[in-house]
Amino acid sequence: MDTAQLTTNPALGVLIFALGGLAGAVFYIPFKKVKNWAWESYWMIYAVAGLVLVPWVLAFSTSADPIGVLKKAPSGEILRCYLYGATWGVGGLTWGLMIRYLGVGLGLAIGCGLCSATGTLIPPILEGRFHDLYGTPSANASLLGVVISLAGIVLVGMAGMSKEKELPDEIKKKAVAEYNFTKGLLVACFSGIMSAGMSFGLQGGKNIESLSLAAGTSATWKGMPVLVIVLLGGFTINFLWCLYLNIKNKTLGDYVKPQTPLLGNLIFAGLAGVIWCSQFICFKTGEPKMGDMAYVGWAVLMASAILFSTLLGIFLGEWKSTSVRTRSLLAVGLVLLLGSSVITGYSGYLGKQSKAAPPADVKQ
């Protein structure tokens, strides 16, 4: 029996994706503890920790000979994964700007929504597996889960627009200091679509994963060498941009100036990177649990991030003083997001059951 089959567990896969979504929703919180540093300075530390240190340490800890695997991998596949990561890097740079203008709840709802739709539906089509999206009970259920998650995202977005119309600027800016819906919406659209490059990259390293398995890595951790390459592409963009801003804004001294809590800043900025990277570690380790329905993992990851980020937004007061209608839209949207994850988990169960079923008797 195939090793991957032995590890298939759709319910556990959905839970792992959901934990990744939680990490994606809260990674920004440690930045609030960074004192007297420019954005580019703490984002640089975040990038070094989350895009370089964590993935490489994890790859060497969980994978058999990751360097050897990457040396044997097709150069074209490595380049594509790297470039997809760089595409994400361009989108990821504006993720923080999106949150600055829209707040955690609304910003991640719109950005993750576009990222979810693009990153879930496009990879199977590019790989010539369009038929995987429909035709069997498990595929139909998984597609239904994706559609429901997108419906939930739309409702959360509608609730956000309703909130934007209802609240006076002073209340909105009390919760989100630089609130600007128009700027935020434009940034979120760009960031969401470009950030889907992460999904393309993480799902585009099949040969690398096969080599990792052949080297003796378990099915659960076979994707770590792919993660390293994709995040390296993202790091390149983030590093160059932050370095440019450090030079332009004369903030290179942030890393050494004595009047700031240097150790605390390094710890909290680095912690944000570690938490952020955790969502994609969860994505790659959850994939093998889903079997043939692994492509829906991106939708579950994004839906979970929106669910948890919206709940965090509620906790932070971003939805305070809104109308019953707005809160109702928000509540229904959150229920749909939660329900989509349940349906996606059930789709994996259907797929597992269909494979376990004995073939029908053939009449002579």
Model-assigned labels for residue ranges:
Residues 1-364:
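Polytopic alpha-helical membrane proteins, predominantly small-molecule transporters/carriers
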